[in-house]
């Protein structure tokens, strides 16, 4: 077998493989004999039909089968001999196979890039440092109470954080427009749900009042016919309401699974959850900086086939989030929506993979156990979740992969230029939410 390797462009390779005539002849005769033994031909006992007749009847299909078998086998042999690692499905281009003659075919494919990670000491990380303060805990308690609050009539003018109930009719140039009319519409003032100027026009008004508000729709408003248009809303204010927060009593506290109903136990549970959330957010922000620095210091080509696979995976994830993964009536989400993220994911995967290979990082059993136990704390019965993971090899392997990735990130962090920055719980969590 003769093999030549050509770099056509970037990571694209073309193999030209020539298989000698004697191997083709041997392969052809083997296939011909097999067909002769298994095919039933009228007038002949099984396996006794003349080969010339077999060739006449099945010659084309035998040649096609031989070509397929020869290409598959010798392509794999060529990859091993040339130490090539293909990405995606190859494109095979055969010439005509003629028994007794050399057979030449070409195979086009992409390969993974060969590189060494470098400049790790040039990666800069600003490591946020934060704790859960008593003030953070009290704020979370108030948020929890607000989430379970009821609304009661307020004998006061409309103000931020109060809820109003209203009827309104919107018009542009004296004409009502679609979607501009509602009855019994509830709105918490200060939430910023409405177009600029709408909520401000309600502030200071009282239940029972009727009034007009003049606003201008933003230029980037979703309805094309309303972009930049001046509008008038005729409003009748039905109610002004305020939140009635539940008391922090045993009945309220037990709703959250705190059996003794004490404020101290509730605070302890909330603090534990906040600290877990903070730890994950801090870890995520450091990881993001590490990966961004790694990408910046190591510019590598990525195989188009790998990016295409990642684009499809991201598309399916998006459809699942919309609950439309199995629907036939969902419009195709274009590749462009996912291209940049897919390329980044592939680059990160290749770079981290090389770090793991170079540093010979293996999953640490203790770390795997810690990861599973940490995940399990979010469930009602953590021990049951831990047992489930250790009894499920697929899930366990997923956690091993996470452990290896964590260890790789820790190695990269140890090589980077790290400075610490004091910050707050809210800043860390808000930043994590914005990045999600």
From Swiss-Prot:
Record's keyword terms, sorted: Cell cycle, Cell division, Chaperone, Cytoplasm, Isomerase, Rotamase
Organism: Tolumonas auensis (strain DSM 9187 / NBRC 110442 / TA 4)
Taxonomy, superkingdom: Bacteria
InterPro entries (UniProt xref): PPIase_dom_sf (IPR046357), PPIase_FKBP_dom (IPR001179), Trig_fac (IPR005215), Trigger_fac_C (IPR008880), Trigger_fac_C_sf (IPR037041), Trigger_fac_ribosome-bd_bac (IPR008881), Trigger_fac_ribosome-bd_sf (IPR036611), Trigger_fact/SurA_dom_sf (IPR027304)
GO cellular component, one term: cytoplasm
Record remark: domains: Consists of 3 domains; the N-terminus binds the ribosome, the middle domain has PPIase activity, while the C-terminus has intrinsic chaperone activity on its own.
Family: Belongs to the FKBP-type PPIase family. Tig subfamily.
The enzyme's E.C. designation: 5.2.1.8
Gene designation per UniProt: tig
Record PROSITE patterns: FKBP_PPIASE (PS50059)
GO molecular function: peptidyl-prolyl cis-trans isomerase activity; protein folding chaperone; ribosome binding
Subcellular location: Cytoplasm
Main location: cytoplasm
Protein name, entry field: Trigger factor
Residue span, PPIase FKBP-type domain: 161-246
A UniProt-annotated Pfam family: Trigger_N
PANTHER family listed in its UniProt record: TRIGGER FACTOR CHAPERONE AND PEPTIDYL-PROLYL CIS/TRANS ISOMERASE, TRIGGER FACTOR-LIKE PROTEIN TIG, CHLOROPLASTIC
């Amino acid at each position: 077998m003769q093999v030549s390797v050509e770099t056509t462009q970037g990571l694209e390779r073309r193999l030209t493989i020539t298989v000698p005539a004697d191997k083709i002849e041997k392969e052809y005769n083997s296939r011909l004999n097999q067909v002769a033994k298994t095919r039933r031909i009228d007038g002949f006992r099984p396996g006794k039909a003349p080969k010339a007749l077999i060739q006449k009847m099945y010659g084309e299909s035998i040649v096609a089968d031989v070509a397929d078998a020869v290409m598959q086998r010798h392509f794999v042999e060529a990859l091993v001999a040339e130490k090539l690692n293909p990405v995606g499905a190859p494109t095979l281009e055969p010439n005509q196979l003629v028994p007794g003659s050399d057979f030449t075919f070409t195979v086009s494919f992409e390969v993974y890039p060969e590189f060494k990670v470098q400049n790790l000491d040039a990666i800069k990380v600003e490591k946020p440092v934060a704790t859960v303060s008593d003030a953070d805990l009290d704020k979370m308690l108030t948020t929890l109470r607000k989430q379970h609050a009821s609304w009661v009539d307020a004998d006061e003018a409309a103000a931020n954080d109060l809820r109003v109930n209203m009827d309104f009719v919107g018009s542009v140039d004296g004409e009502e427009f679609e979607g501009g009319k509602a009855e019994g519409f509830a709105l918490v003032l200060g939430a910023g749900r409405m177009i600029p100027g709408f909520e401000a026009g309600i502030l200071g008004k009282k239940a029972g009042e009727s009034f007009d508000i003049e606003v201008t729709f933003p230029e980037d408003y979703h309805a094309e016919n309303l972009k930049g248009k001046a509008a008038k809303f005729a409003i009748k204010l039905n109610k002004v309401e305020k939140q009635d927060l539940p008391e922090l009593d045993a009945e309220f506290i037990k709703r959250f699974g705190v059996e003794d109903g004490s404020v101290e136990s509730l605070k302890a549970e909330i603090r534990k959850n906040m600290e877990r959330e903070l730890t994950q957010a801090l870890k995520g922000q450091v990881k993001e900086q590490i990966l961004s620095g790694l990408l910046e210091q190591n510019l590598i080509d990525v195989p188009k086939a790998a990016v295409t696979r990642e684009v499809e995976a991201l598309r399916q994830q998006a459809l699942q989030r919309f609950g439309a993964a199995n629907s036939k009536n969902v419009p195709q989400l274009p590749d462009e929506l996912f291209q940049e993220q897919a390329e980044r994911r592939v680059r990160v995967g290749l770079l981290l993979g090389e770090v793991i290979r170079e540093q010979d990082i293996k999953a640490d059993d203790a770390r795997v156990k810690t990861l599973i136990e940490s995940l399990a704390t979010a469930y009602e019965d953590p021990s049951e979740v831990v047992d489930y993971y250790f009894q499920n090899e697929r899930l366990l392997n997923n956690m091993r992969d996470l452990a290896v990735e964590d260890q790789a990130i820790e190695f990269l962090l140890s090589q980077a230029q790290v400075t610490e920055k004091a910050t707050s719980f809210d800043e860390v969590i808000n930043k994590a939410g914005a990045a999600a």
